[in-house]
Amino acid sequence: MKVGERHYHTIWLNEDGRSVDIIDQRWLPHEFRVVTLKTVADVADAIRDMWVRGAPLIGVTAAYGVAIAMAKDPSDAHLDAVWEELNETRPTAINLRWALNAMREYLRPLPEAERADAAYKRAAEIAEEDVELNRAIGANGLDVIREIASKKKPGEPVRILTHCNAGWLATVDYGTATAPIYMAVEEGIPVHVYVDETRPRNQGAYLTAWEMNGHGVPHTLIVDNAGGHLMQHGDIDMVIVGTDRTTANGDVCNKIGTYLKALAARDNDVPFYVALPSPTIDWTVQDGVKEIPIEERTADEVSFVQGRAADGSIASVRISPEGSPAANPAFDVTPARLITGLITERGIATPSPEGLKALFPERS
């Protein structure tokens, strides 16, 4: 996507052929910074501390982390050690483990002398595959927006609620939940996006709103608790979110608060869609509530908020009393029964084992 007059991916290989650059998302929307990752420790920090975030982008970043590791030490022991180190950074996003497995399975049969170059080649392929998957997701989701738009009066926008950031900043490009929105805008379909702020890290306010601004998409930032009210009053035509892990039966694990949006959507007959590339599907898990590990993040993310101060500096301020404990589960699980459809690169699946296997028969 474009930032100013330049087209960016969220991650790219440097001219030295070894280090990678990323957009450091901790500073958005106030500052646009690019940082270089040169070591596995850099990559682990970037994933764990959310310099990069979003399940697809985490996976691609980890793939490049393996490549960086192979350039230093291509042994089996180092390959396994790096797999373990990076896999522990974010436990919920399945794309992380998928990418690490893809890299290890590709590299293991190769002679050690060939592994470094092969690793960078495979990581670049995973990055490009992500772009193509998201483009296909966008085309399939666009059909849903077109259908809703066809029932509107001329010029009346399709009103879309989204939660967290499943935009191009969460992937290499296009995004998952935002890809259909961007394609609708490019096609001339009027849309208006309601952006949940998404506490506690405010990815909606910081990132999705920044994306919408940059792409010229009409949007309104709302507090997390306003979505149900808007649905009650007929102000939302559809909800579309991303996912960090989707089970074989169609349960969806996404940013905390997604489940409440799905409940409100069901109560108000608002279609609730989830956009995802197939590497986000965990075919080994059936019951998302019981089986998916939920990352617990630091209490400081709840007790403090970051923003731009009056003097222009970026400041973090406490918003809760000293000594008040805070819980910070990063994700929740939305049961398949609350989901209208799963928008994948192969089409829109009904959220069920049968629906997913119809699109992915190789998993039967």
Curated annotation (Swiss-Prot):
Binding site for substrate: R53, G54, A55, R90, Q203, N254, K255
Enzyme class name: isomerase
Molecular-function GO terms, alphabetical: S-methyl-5-thioribose-1-phosphate isomerase activity
A Pfam family recorded for this sequence: IF-2B
Keyword Isomerase: yes
Protein origin, superkingdom: Bacteria
Annotated pathway: Amino-acid biosynthesis; L-methionine biosynthesis via salvage pathway; L-methionine from S-methyl-5-thio-alpha-D-ribose 1-phosphate: step 1/6
BP GO terms, sorted: L-methionine salvage from methylthioadenosine
Entry EC no(s): 5.3.1.23
Catalytic center residues: D244 (proton donor)
Stored PANTHER family: METHYLTHIORIBOSE-1-PHOSPHATE ISOMERASE
Protein family (similarity comment): Belongs to the eIF-2B alpha/beta/delta subunits family. MtnA subfamily.
Biological role stated in the UniProt entry: Catalyzes the interconversion of methylthioribose-1-phosphate (MTR-1-P) into methylthioribulose-1-phosphate (MTRu-1-P).
Protein's name according to its UniProt entry: Methylthioribose-1-phosphate isomerase
Gene: mtnA
